[in-house]
Design a protein with these regions (language model features):
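A short acidic, helix-capping loop that chelates divalent metal ions and anchors anionic groups
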Residues: 40-46, 79, 172, 244-248
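Short coil/turn segments at secondary-structure junctions
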Residues: 43, 102-105, 135, 211, ...
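Glycine-rich, proline-tolerant flexible connector loops at the mouths of alpha/beta enzymes
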Residues: 33-58
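Active-site beta-loop-alpha junctions enriched in small/polar residues
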Residues: 8-12, 35-39, 75-78, 106-109, ...
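Histidine-acidic metal/acid-base catalytic patches
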Residues: 1-6, 13-31, 64, 93-98, ...
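Active-site acidic/histidine proton-transfer and metal-coordination neighborhood
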Residues: 62-69, 75-162, 171, 269-276
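Alpha-helix N-cap and loop-to-helix initiation/capping positions
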Residues: 16, 47-55, 82-89, 109-116, ...
Length: 282
């Protein structure tokens, strides 16, 4: 089965969705994962197509002309005092553009409250035939794989999923074998990248790397292959923000190199796995 790839918006954050789509098409991606929910972070553009009819039209035009599709949208955060209904316009726009999923993360330490609101988000997304895929983030309130699993089990929604980001997984000191016991139906896509093996002790430094210095696959110290080998076949979203490389190469070339390195790494890892299985069988 052909491996499909999506271009995550954080990789090319300065590009509006139409430009992102054209870049993805030229590089050879199958999908885009746009950030249609504005988070209000310093220096981060607002790409809310639900509130910008012209941007929505231009995005539709780009998708139609290139054949690239929307895989998932970002980022429905569960914050203190969040009203999940505030995400309805983005969910509707996502469905209109053919998306399959909405990515979510939890930033409130109030676990029971977070579970309740995550469940409400899942219920809202269900009417648009969207899954809600939770990621553990090392600087958020749900940090580890165990944290995310706890939320999913207690929320108990049939359209809830678990999104593994290889950077976050490594930073949380999670073990790949822990993925074996989890329901396969939870896994819809993964975000993949590499990064330095050393885990920053400082939150600010971890955030800086997370948002602006991730590495091409095979370039850093994360055993990405060990993580992917525990997951079912799925779309890989390439979230590889690197501010210095973007300044040097431009968004288009950086996105292309992200995909080329991922394809090479995944292909080489698949060959190694076949050799290992053959050796064990012999």
């Amino acid at each position: 089965m052909k491996q499909q790839y999506s271009l995550a918006h954080l990789t090319v954050l300065g590009c509006p969705p139409p430009e992102m789509t054209y870049i993805a098409a030229r590089a050879g991606y199958d999908f885009i994962s746009p950030r249609f929910i504005y988070m209000g972070l310093p220096g981060e553009p607002n790409y809310e197509v639900a509130r910008n009819p012209q941007l929505l039209r231009e995005t539709k035009r780009a998708l139609k002309s290139t054949g690239v599709r929307v895989h998932d949208i970002e980022l429905a955060r569960i914050l203190d005092d969040v009203d999940p209904r505030s995400y309805l316009p983005a969910l509707e726009a996502a469905a209109e553009l053919g998306a399959r999923a909405v990515l979510s993360s939890i930033w409130t330490p109030r676990r029971e409250y977070a579970i309740e609101k995550f469940g409400e988000l899942c219920d809202l997304a269900r009417q648009f035939k969207l899954t809600v895929d939770l990621e553990a983030v090392p600087v958020a309130a749900v940090v580890t794989l165990a944290d995310a699993v706890d939320v999913l089990r207690k929320a108990d929604r049939d359209n809830a999923g678990l999104m593994i980001d290889t950077h976050h997984f490594h930073r949380a000191l999670d073990r790949p074998e822990a993925l074996d016991a989890l329901p396969r139906k939870w896994f819809h896509f993964a975000q993949i990248c590499d990064a330095q093996r050393e885990i920053p002790a400082d939150r600010a430094e971890m955030t800086r790397i997370m948002r602006g210095e991730r590495l091409y696959l095979g370039e850093g110290g994360i055993d990405v292959g060990a993580i992917l080998s525990r997951l079912p076949h799925m779309v890989y979203s390439l979230e590889v923000p690197h501010l210095a490389r973007v300044r040097e190469l431009g968004y288009a070339e950086h996105a292309f190199r992200c995909l080329e390195s991922a394809r090479s790494y995944v292909a080489a890892h698949a060959v190694r796995r076949k050799v290992q299985r053959a050796t064990i069988a012999a």
